[in-house]
Each structure stands twice: as C-alpha cells, then as structure tokens.
C-alpha cells in the first residue's frame, strides 16, 4: 500500500513553553514549575522546567533545524507566566513580548507555520494559591485578559 500526502501537508513538531523554554527571565512560576520544585524526583533524571531543552536561549538554532529536516509547522505555547507581568491588570512583560515576537519572526523567516497554544501546564501558581485556580471565575476572567493580550 502506498500513501501519498498533499503537497501542502503540515509536517511539524510540537512542544510547549513549560516543557521546553526553561525558566530564564520568568517573573512568575506556574503549576508545572511548582510541581518540579516540590517533587523533582518525579521527573526523569531530575530534568524539569528550570532549563528544559533551553528553547528560550536556542530557539533560532532549533527552528533552523526544523527547516533543515523539512518541517513546515511548529506548535508551541505562550506561557501566561512569561508574557504577563501583572495578572490582575494584564500588563505584559517586555522580555516575554520580545521573546515570543522573536519566535514568531524566526518561524516566518524559516517558512514555518506556527500554531500557538495559550494554555499548557502553565496556570500561574499564585492564582491557584490565591483563588483556587480554574474553579474561580476571576481566574477565568484573568485568562481571558491574557488571551486578548
């Protein structure tokens, strides 16, 4: 049996911010960061979100490799805890904006379609502690504010 794929088929790779970026220059922890802080032994070889695959520092090289092997799409996430400085006001963090703009620009320069996920293991731990996480309508409203940023 022979399979053929359409010429414009999306061949891609996927990851998420908490699983790839590392915690470099992040002002806030998310629940994934917190889980690693309290139970690092549960992570394979103790490797967790502190450095992860270092995408924060190596995204240009990583995305060039995607292009080199013929991939044309990439799914990742925008971390709420990296993009937003103040969760209540929705004020963006300049470094987070710079980073995600850089990732998007690099994808475009390499002919890679980017798909951005807005939530992947990154509920801000302080919103969980203060309001109870997703059970709180206020947290949902704050997420909507983040999504509109």
Stretches with model-predicted labels:
Residues 1-71:
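N-terminal carbohydrate-binding accessory modules
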Residues 24, 63-149:
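Substrate-binding cleft and catalytic face of glycoside hydrolase catalytic domains
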């Amino acid at each position: 049996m022979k399979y053929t794929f359409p010429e414009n088929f999306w061949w891609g790779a996927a990851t998420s911010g908490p699983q790839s970026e590392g915690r470099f220059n992040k002002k806030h922890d998310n629940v994934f960061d917190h889980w690693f802080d309290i139970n690092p032994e549960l992570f394979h070889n103790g490797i967790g979100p502190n450095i992860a695959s270092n995408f924060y520092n190596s995204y240009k090289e990583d995305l060039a490799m995607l292009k080199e092997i013929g991939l044309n799409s990439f799914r990742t996430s925008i971390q709420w805890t990296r993009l937003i400085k103040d969760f209540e006001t929705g004020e963006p963090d300049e470094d987070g904006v710079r980073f995600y703009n850089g990732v998007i620009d690099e994808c475009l320069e390499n002919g890679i379609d980017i798909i951005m996920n807005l939530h992947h293991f990154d509920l801000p731990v302080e919103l969980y502690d203060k309001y109870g996480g997703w059970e709180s309508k206020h947290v949902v409203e704050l997420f909507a504010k983040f999504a509109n940023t």
